[in-house]
Amino acid sequence: LFIADREKAYQEKMKNEEDWTCFYTLNIHGGEAQFAFAVPYKAVKMKKAGKKLVLTVKYDYNKPDLSHMEEGEEKKAALKAWKEEKDYEVFDELPFWANGQGIVNKKRTRLAVYDMESGSCEIVTPDYENVESSWVEGDDTILYVSSLYTDKKDVYQGLKQYTVSTGELETLVEQKDMSIDYACILKGKVTFFGSYMKEYGFNENDKLYTVEDGKVELLSDYDDSVHNSICCDCKFADGVSAVHDEDKIYFIATLRKQSVIRTFDA
């Protein structure tokens, strides 16, 4: 299953400012790709959760939601008004621009769940919440790090858990005093890299924590980097800096002049 842009009908919709993403299937033994389905959002990533797909979508609050409007005068009027105002931008948030992303004012990354049996697709994260990282645990659980703001973005992040089968959204770590990098479930317990940023400030290295019943506990007072910071503007590849199985986290660390792979056993 992959994302592509080959359907003329949807190409026309996207030319008219509608957000659609088309998905195709390709037999691993050969043959042509076949159109599978389309969702009325701008999806950029997908992860499988049982018989459903967890989609990372780009959502623009500046635009009218044309993809969900019925064809008619209301939709035509909304499109006309949007096109007439495209020669200027209103900045009413901080930050309104980001390096490598361009204008980010009123733009968020959100999560949607697509049901491959019914064909329904629904955004499952709150309005104006920006999802910064997400992980699918098993067939039914999504962990994600987010920042909720409507005027000025906070330096702190929260950790949430969404249960696909029930639609329940639970806040595990409040967005009030931590920076969070990576989260997973190890041996049945939510475990994450994070920092209170009290010793060295914003770029302070992470420590390893667990959270249960709203209580955050230090698991390891680790003080080295949990990322590969040995790089330059010209490099061959990039990818995730941490992965996990049921028992351990495997991550890249920077030690002086070299990067190494380390593990944590929860």
Please annotate each region the language model reported.
Residues 4-22, 38-42, 57-110, 125-131, ...:
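A flexible loop/linker signature enriched in serine peptidases of the S9 family
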